A protein has these predicted regions:
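Short, well-ordered beta-strand core segments
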Residues: 38, 81, 129-131
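Fold-independent oxyanion-binding glycine-rich loops
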Residues: 12-14, 84-87, 113-116, 133-134, ...
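Haloarchaeal acidic low-complexity proteome signature biased toward cell-envelope/secretome components but also
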Residues: 1-10, 17-26, 31, 46-49, ...
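General small-molecule cofactor/ligand-binding pocket signal
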Residues: 10, 63-67, 130
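Short, well-ordered alpha-helix to beta-strand connector turns
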Residues: 35, 77-79, 126-127
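Structured adenosyl-cofactor binding patch, chiefly the S-adenosyl-L-methionine
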Residues: 122-171
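S-adenosyl-L-methionine/SAH cofactor-binding core of RNA-modifying enzymes
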Residues: 48-121
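Short internal beta-strands
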Residues: 36-44
Length: 187
């Protein structure tokens, strides 16, 4: 997470009109579950703005940026590349190895999450092709499960710096307060 070697998420591909919500949720999930930044394709500007707005309101640290060359990001990444795909090795068989590379060896991780059909060169360039259940499902779900396994649940306890507001956990109802007032609302 934020004290460790970097974890970045690359959204590979974005179909305007079709992928707006999913691309945004890739970014929001990356932020909420411990990644340091997300890189969106350059045609995903609305997703970028939404993720930046949420980070401004609910805290960070987290960066969101656009890239005009996502394949170059993979090729030039200085660290390990994990491609999340339903065709990869089972997450439960490789998560410890990936965690060791990240935690013990200090390797930065780039998590690649596809949209449309992913070209074969991504499979070849990845250090790991990882499948969460090896069944068709949402790339957001795959990213969430992978990040939780990578951080072993530590991401669920993170503090949010520079937040304008804070959600107060409740059994029933919804409560959002100014961040400065959050401590007096926690039991």
């Amino acid at each position: 997470m934020h004290d460790d070697s970097e974890v970045a998420v690359l959204r590979l591909g974005h179909r305007p009109g079709r992928d707006e919500r999913m691309t945004t949720h890739v970014g929001l999930t990356a932020r909420a579950l411990g990644a340091d930044r997300v890189l969106f394709p350059d045609n995903a500007g609305q997703s970028l703005e939404t993720v930046r707005d949420i980070t401004d309101r609910f805290g960070g640290p987290f960066e969101a940026e656009l890239t005009d060359s996502p394949h170059a990001v993979i090729r030039n990444w200085e660290g390990q590349v994990v491609h999340l795909t339903m065709y990869g090795e089972r997450v439960q068989d490789v998560d410890a190895e990936i965690r060791t590379a990240h935690d013990s060896e200090g390797e930065a991780l780039l998590l690649v999450v596809g949209s449309e059909k992913v070209s074969f060169d991504v499979y070849e360039e990845a250090d790991w092709n990882v499948g969460v259940t090896n069944q068709p499902h949402s790339e957001v779900a795959g990213l969430a499960v992978f990040l939780d396994r990578l951080f072993e649940g530590r991401e669920l306890e993170q503090d949010w710096a520079d937040a304008d507001r804070t959600v107060i956990p409740m059994e029933t109802g919804k409560r959002v307060v100014p961040a400065d007032d959050a401590d007096e609302h926690h039991e």
